[in-house]
Amino acid sequence: MAAPALLLLALLLPVGAWPGLPRRPCVHCCRPAWPPGPYARVSDRDLWRGDLWRGLPRVRPTIDIEILKGEKGEAGVRGRAGRSGKEGPPGARGLQGRRGQKGQVGPPGAACRRAYAAFSVGRREGLHSSDHFQAVPFDTELVNLDGAFDLAAGRFLCTVPGVYFLSLNVHTWNYKETYLHIMLNRRPAAVLYAQPSERSVMQAQSLMLLLAAGDAVWVRMFQRDRDNAIYGEHGDLYITFSGHLVKPAAEL
C-alpha cells in the first residue's frame, strides 16, 4: 500500500519540489558513467531549460592533416641556372696528402742507337810534291764506315759530329824532305815534318779534333825549295791515315 502511495505522490508534485535531492545522470549497468569525469551541479532552472550538459567540458573535434595529405607529385621542370657568384678569396693551403702507391712498370723504350764513325786508309805508291800544295790521295781502304772517306780526293767528310782521334804515319825518303799537314777544311791543324837524311825513317803525327757535321779532314803535301816526298812500295803499306769517333757531340 505504501509503494503505490509514494508513486502517486511523485507524479502529483511539481518540478522543483525536491530541492534537497541531488540530480545525477543515468548510469547503465554495463557501461561507464556518462558523461565521464567530474560534473557540476545542475540547477532546476537549467534542468527546466533542458541544458543538461551545462558545466561539462567541451569536446572539440580535431582533424589529422596527415590523413588528408595526398601522394607526392611528379618533379617539376628544372629551372635555369642562376648567375655565377663573385670569386671568393683563395682558401688556406691544405695539408700535404699521403704518398701514392708505386705505379706500374712502363713499356720498354726503343733501343738506344749508338753513333759510330771510323776510317783507316793507306797508300802503297810513293809521292813527290810538284805543286805548291797537293792533296795526298789514297789507294787502299782498310776501314771506311758508311763510305765517309773519299779515296781519290783523300778526304774524310764528317757525318757524326763529335770528338775524333786522327793519326798519320809515313815513311820518309832518303835525302828528301818530308813536310805534310793534317788539314781541317782549309786550315792546317797539325804538321808532320822530317829533315833530309841519308836514312829513311817512319814518322808519325796524331791529334784529336772536335768536328762538326760537314767538316772535311785531309792530308796536304807542302813544297818548298828542297824536294818533298813520301816513300811507298806496292808490296808493303808505309803510308796510313786513320781516324775514329771518340765521343759524339750529343754526349758532350
Curated annotation (Swiss-Prot):
Gene3D superfamilies in the record: 2.60.120.40
InterPro entries: C1q_dom (IPR001073), Cerebellin_Synaptic_Org (IPR050822), Collagen (IPR008160), Tumour_necrosis_fac-like_dom (IPR008983)
Entry keyword annotation includes Signal: yes
Compartments (UniProt record): Secreted
Ranges of residues in domain Collagen-like: 69-111
Tissues of expression: Expressed predominantly in lung and testis. Expressed in astrocytes.
Keyword entries, A-Z: Collagen, Secreted, Signal
GO annotation terms (biological process): positive regulation of cell motility
Domain spans labelled C1q: 112-252
Alphabetical list of PROSITE patterns matching this protein: C1Q
GO annotation, cellular component aspect: collagen trimer; extracellular space
Signal peptide annotation: 1-17
Post-translational modification: Not N-glycosylated.
SUPFAM superfamilies registered for this protein in UniProt: TNF-like
Chain residue ranges for the region called Disordered: 74-109
Pfam families in the record: C1q, Collagen
SMART domains: C1Q
Keyword Secreted: yes
Function recorded in the entry: May play a role as ligand of RXFP1.
Subunit structure: Homotrimer. Forms heteromeric complexes with C1QL1. Interacts with RXFP1.
Protein name: Complement C1q tumor necrosis factor-related protein 8
